[in-house]
Regions:
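Tandem CBS (Bateman) regulatory domains
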Residues: 2-22, 60-91, 100, 104-108, ...
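The conserved cystathionine-beta-synthase
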Residues: 26-43, 50, 93-111, 118, ...
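Generic amphipathic, hydrophobic interface segment in small proteins and small subunits
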Residues: 41-65
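RNA-contacting regions in translation and RNA-metabolism proteins
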Residues: 114, 173, 189
Length: 271
């Protein structure tokens, strides 16, 4: 019995085995422009905020997009907002020795999408859905897990329209479709960058008008990496890891038929 338990523990994967150790983090007093610059440089959407190495919270592209688009913050450029003004203090922490199975059980559940790995109040790393993708091994077809009920927008729709859909339906990104053809993707990240640029370059008195008229085609991400329904789940995970993206549209005969996210892929993991 003791030997079996020892073997099971030996084979058990822990958070420290998959977490990102070289964490990009910021002090609470840095300006929001610096935060956005880091997100763009390292292609990340979440950054822990610290003070004297103690974790205070997390900043996400979602929160930045919301804050910069809110009426109260209109006219205030990102360079004049501090990280502390957009920090999410409702964060979760885990210890480095936590069983990965415990983390997988949280995937898809309401709550934070980044877990901060802390020991003795010191931030050692973070673990996100992207870090868990190497666990995906299923050879089932993407068609068996893809989301078929889609929310889409057109390139000539306004950015504020896309943002409203994302808030109301609690989704992080939208496919952009023009006359049945997928032409781009828009997410919290693109919206946050666009709002920051608008506030920097447009005079205060004209910002509301420009924001109301800002079109999706002006900020959407293109070209789009996609898969077909017959792509295997494990290959889809590899594509996400190679391209550092959180979702993949599914096309069949050049028609958008579904979408898969990291969450969809991780739900196939039997660990």
């Amino acid at each position: 019995m003791g030997v079996k338990n020892t073997e099971r523990k030996k084979n058990m994967m822990e958070v420290k085995d998959l977490m990102t150790k070289d964490v990009i983090c910021v002090d609470k007093d840095v300006d929001l422009k610096h935060v956005l610059d880091l997100m763009k440089k390292y292609e990340i959407t979440k950054i822990p905020v610290v003070e004297n190495k103690k974790l205070l919270g997390v900043i996400t592209d979602n929160i930045i997009a919301y804050k910069l688009g809110s009426i109260r913050k209109r006219g205030v450029p990102a360079s004049r907002l501090h990280a502390s003004s957009v920090i999410d203090k409702e964060f979760e922490t885990v210890e480095p020795g936590t069983d990965i199975k415990t983390i997988l059980g949280k995937v898809g559940a309401p709550g934070p999408t980044i877990l901060n790995v802390v020991e003795n109040e010191k931030l050692l790393g973070v673990i996100t859905k992207a870090d868990l993708l190497p666990l995906v091994k299923s050879h089932s077809k993407v068609a068996s897990i893809m989301q078929k009920k889609l929310s889409i927008v057109a390139p000539d729709d306004r950015v504020i329209h896309a943002r409203r859909i994302m808030i109301d339906r609690n989704i992080a990104r939208l496919p952009v479709v023009d006359h049945g053809k997928l032409v781009g993707m828009i997410s919290d990240t693109e919206i946050a960058f666009a709002l920051a640029e608008l506030k920097k370059s447009i005079p205060l008195g004209q910002q509301k008008h420009h924001l109301d008229e800002l079109l999706i085609e002006d900020v959407m991400k293109t070209p789009v990496t996609w898969v077909n329904p017959d792509t295997s789940v494990v290959d889809a995970a590899k594509i996400m890891m190679e391209n550092n993206i959180g979702s993949l549209p599914v096309l069949e005969n050049n028609k958008l038929v579904g979408i898969i996210t990291r969450t969809d892929l991780l739900k196939t993991v039997n660990y």
